């Protein structure tokens, strides 16, 4: 069974850079560490830009399946996590639903929320990376803007806190300091035995 470490945050937080950046030092310590890219990117390239909250279900299922299939490795570092899909669905809640449509949305959200909560236990360490660290252009697939990323950031943060998810919020800004901070947390948590050379 692998050690599973997830970096979660909105677009522009730098979570992918951090997830990729922590893998190489672990490999140099002879740890079988693998970076796992967010399956939602592949889904959106295949299906086109996000258009309906029900798309969060296949994204959740594909991400969960990927998380299970990679377990033969020693150490997995993700730039997202399956449970994030519930925060996305909450963020994508349409504001102009009639009563029947609202009931359908609430049913779907409760279902995905329950599945997402169960997946949280899959991870030994979660890093929350706040947005706003890097300037945003338009994402070619999600078409995020600054205010949208900030809104998702608030929803995701609230989701973690509401479910008492244990996570470490990355505080550093400089990339080397961030990697040092992350590796210190991994060592303190007993997930690595020594600090890598950064």
Residue ranges, per PLM feature:
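Hydrophobic positions on the alpha1 helix immediately C-terminal to the Walker A/P-loop
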Residues: 18
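Hydrophobic anchor at the beta1->P-loop junction of P-loop NTPases
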Residues: 7
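Conserved nucleotide-sensing/catalytic segment adjacent to the nucleotide-binding pocket
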Residues: 48-97
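A glycine- and Lys/Arg-enriched "phosphate-lid" helix/loop adjacent to the NTP-binding pocket
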Residues: 92-174
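Walker A (P-loop) phosphate-binding loop of P-loop NTPases
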Residues: 12
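C-terminal accessory "lid"/substrate-recognition subdomains
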Residues: 165-169, 176, 180-198
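Conserved substrate/cofactor phosphate-moiety recognition/catalytic segment
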Residues: 23-64
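Conserved lysine of the Walker
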Residues: 15
């Amino acid at each position: 069974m692998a050690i599973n470490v997830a970096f979660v945050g909105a677009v522009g937080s730098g979570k992918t850079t951090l997830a990729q950046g922590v893998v190489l030092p672990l490999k140099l310590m002879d740890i079988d560490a693998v970076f796992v890219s967010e399956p939602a990117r592949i889904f959106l390239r295949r299906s086109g830009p996000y258009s309906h909250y029900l798309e969060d279900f296949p994204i959740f299922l594909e991400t969960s399946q990927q998380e299970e299939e990679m377990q033969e490795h020693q150490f997995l570092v993700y730039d997202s996590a399956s449970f994030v899909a519930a925060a996305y669905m909450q963020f994508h809640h349409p504001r102009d639903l009639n009563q029947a449509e609202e009931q359908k949305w609430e049913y779907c959200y409760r279902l995905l929320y329950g599945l997402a909560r169960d997946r949280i236990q899959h991870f030994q360490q979660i890093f929350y990376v706040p947005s706003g660290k890097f300037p945003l252009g338009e994402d070619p697939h999600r078409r995020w803007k600054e205010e949208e990323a900030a809104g998702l950031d608030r929803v995701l943060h609230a989701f973690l806190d509401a479910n008492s998810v244990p996570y470490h919020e990355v505080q550093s800004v400089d990339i080397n300091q961030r990697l040092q901070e992350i590796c210190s947390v991994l060592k303190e948590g007993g997930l690595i035995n020594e600090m890598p050379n950064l």
